């Protein structure tokens, strides 16, 4: 018997039973293959919604999540199989960073249960808080961590600080600027909630442990998402390697800080600037004392002081780079094309730099989307506003605001009606896509129909 379109498989007499078995397996495999129905072509990718910097603006964050159709009125996930990407900077400046992180942590679980996904990426402010760079943490931020035991903890920490000062006279003499001398000064710089915030953002803290599990960059359906951007100098670095390096740097920071605490060089609540000053002074004090060198200890000190060269804190690193906003079209277009070719990607989506007019800004032939629109409007007054970027079917990019939504790039890759690439409202100018920008109901993601405003 000869299968349709196939060859006759013969087992010659005298051959081993094994040959017969193998031939039978081949026949069965061919028959099963014929019996399988044809595979349906893969459908378009599930929707992706990206939101940029939040900076503790919980209320507007909730509003834009609802507007984009990701959560319901009780703030539970309703986005189905949608992927929600937040490109970093949940923290600092605004009044409710804890509420923002609590919501993100809840949505991660709820989205996964519904077949969707929440991708929370690190921004420079997450890295700063984990490393104790507290320049943008406000008294209101600290106060949100305070509880009934905060005053007692403050007093105990101050006593520990006084004891430390008394034991480090030679070191303190080498400080370029004196540390706090009085209890009043110390309390002013360590308000209620300060100690609790440091613990919560530490490696074993509720938020610190969660943040340390996050990546800095993600690629989804050919679109690369991150906080700042990829500088051409790092184009040879794979995205996975980038994420690993930043995670390793934060781990190294935590380990060095723990070692320095055990050596009684620093206290757990010292901020980054204080640690740097103390270690620099310690190096000078040891040289002046001409004591035998403790090589292991000096190596740890030097390692810590070199953290400014780390990828996670460099100004051209993925958490800090602002080139996509600052480059001219002539300078940036070829650079972006090379980056996308290198990573076999189609677009880049970044936050970090607030866009004028509070509008999502496409650049370089609509290959880059700048999505930080200054959500914390009280800080970025008068232009700041909440926004989201919907990516539909991997080809249609839509800017979503609380009062309207605007198609920035359609499925053919051409410019929307009303302007050439880079010349629509997303660019922050006065151009318009149409006389009546499309407005969709708040509970529809990537809807095919639009309702014009009345």
Residue spans for each PLM region:
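Bacterial N-terminal signal peptides that target proteins for export
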Residues: 4-21
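Low-complexity intrinsically disordered segments
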Residues: 5, 25-26, 429
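Bacterial N-terminal signal peptides
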Residues: 20-31
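Feature recognizes metal-dependent phosphohydrolase scaffolds
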Residues: 32-454
């Amino acid at each position: 018997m000869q299968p349709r379109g196939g060859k006759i498989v013969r087992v010659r007499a005298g051959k081993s039973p094994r040959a017969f078995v193998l031939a039978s397996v081949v026949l069965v495999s061919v028959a099963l293959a014929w019996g399988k129905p044809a595979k349906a072509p893969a459908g378009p990718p599930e929707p992706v919604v990206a939101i940029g910097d939040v900076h503790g603006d919980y209320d507007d964050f909730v509003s834009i999540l609802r507007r984009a159709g990701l959560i319901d009125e009780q703030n539970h996930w309703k986005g189905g199989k949608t992927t929600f990407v937040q490109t970093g900077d949940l923290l600092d400046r605004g009044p409710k960073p804890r509420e923002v992180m609590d919501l993100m942590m809840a949505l991660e679980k709820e989205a996964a249960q519904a077949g969707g996904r929440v991708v929370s990426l690190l921004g420079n402010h997450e890295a700063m808080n984990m490393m104790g760079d507290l320049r943008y943490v406000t008294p209101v931020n600290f106060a949100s961590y305070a509880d009934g035991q905060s005053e007692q903890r403050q007093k105990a920490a101050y006593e520990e600080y006084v004891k430390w000062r008394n034991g480090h006279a030679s070191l303190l003499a080498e400080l370029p600027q004196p540390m706090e001398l009085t209890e009043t000064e110390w309390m002013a710089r360590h308000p209620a909630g300060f100690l609790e915030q440091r613990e919560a953002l530490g490696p074993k803290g509720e938020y610190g442990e969660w943040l340390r599990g996050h990546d800095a960059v993600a690629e989804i359906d050919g679109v690369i998402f991150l906080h700042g951007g990829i500088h051409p100098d790092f184009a040879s670095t794979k995205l996975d390697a980038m994420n690993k390096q930043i995670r390793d740097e934060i781990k190294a920071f935590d380990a060095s800080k723990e070692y320095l605490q055990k050596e009684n060089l620093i206290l757990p609540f010292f901020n980054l600037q204080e640690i740097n000053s103390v270690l620099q002074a310690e190096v000078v004090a040891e040289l002046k004392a001409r004591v035998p060198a403790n090589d292991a200890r000096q190596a740890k000190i030097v390692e810590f002081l070199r953290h400014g060269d780390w990828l996670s804190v460099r100004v051209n690193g993925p958490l800090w780079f602002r080139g996509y906003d600052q480059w001219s079209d002539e300078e940036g277009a070829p650079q972006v094309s090379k980056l996308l070719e290198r990573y076999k990607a189609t677009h880049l989506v970044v936050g970090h730099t607030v866009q004028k007019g509070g509008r999502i800004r496409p650049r370089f032939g609509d290959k880059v989307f700048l999505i930080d629109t200054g959500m914390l409007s009280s800080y970025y007054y008068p232009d700041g506003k909440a926004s989201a970027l919907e990516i539909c079917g991997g080809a249609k990019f839509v800017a979503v605001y609380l009062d309207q939504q605007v198609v920035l790039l359609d499925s053919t890759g051409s410019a929307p009606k009303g302007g050439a690439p880079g010349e629509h409202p997303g660019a922050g100018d006065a151009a318009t896509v149409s006389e009546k920008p499309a407005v969709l109901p708040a509970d529809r993601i990537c809807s095919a129909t639009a309702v014009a405003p009345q």
